[in-house]
Amino acid sequence: MRPLDRKIYLASKSPRRRELLRQIGVEFELLMLRNDTVRGPDVTEDAYEGESPADYVARVANEKAEFAWNMVHQRRMKIRPVLAADTTVTIDGEILGKPGSQAEAIAMLEKLSGRTHQVLTSVAVHFTDLSEQFTQVSDVRFAKLSAASIKAYCATSEPYDKAGG
C-alpha cells in the first residue's frame, strides 16, 4: 500500500497564507492563478452590484478553488486537495480591496483610522467530488492614525498586497 500523499495545492499569492500553512506543518505546492495563460474569465475579484461582502468573499474563494481544481486536471497534475482563500475588508457596507496606488492606500487608511471595520476571510477546499467552504468575520478596531504615519506606511510596499491596505 502506498503512503498517503499529504501535500495540498495552495491557490494563493498571499505570503501570509503560505506562512500560516508552514506554521501548522502543512506541505503545499503553490498554484499561481494570476498571469496564467489558462486563466479565463471564470475568476473575477470585482464585486457584483448588490453583492454583500460575505457573498463576495465566499464567491471569490470558491471561484479560485474551482479554477485551480480545473487547472490541476487540465495539466494532468497529481490529484491533491486544492485550498484557496480570499480576504476583504468592509466598512460602512463598502468592500475595500487591495489598493492600486498610494493615493488609494492613503484614502483607505484614513477611512479606517479610529474606527471599527470587518475583515472577512473565506476558505474553499476542492478535492475529487468534495467541496467545503467557510467564512470567518472579525471585527477590527483601528487606533486613530496620524496623517504622517499613514503617509510613511504607504511609502513602503506593505499596504499593496492586502485588502484595506
Feature-to-residue mapping (PLM):
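Cofactor-binding loop segments of dinucleotide-utilizing enzymes, especially the Rossmann-like FAD-
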Residues: 13, 33, 128
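A short small-residue
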Residues: 36-48
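N-terminal beta1-alpha1 ligand-phosphate binding loop
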Residues: 2-27
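Anionic-ligand binding patches
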Residues: 2-6, 22, 47-165
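A short beta-strand-loop structural module common to alpha/beta enzyme folds
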Residues: 27-39
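Surface-exposed, flexible loop/turn segments at secondary-structure boundaries
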Residues: 16, 36-38, 131
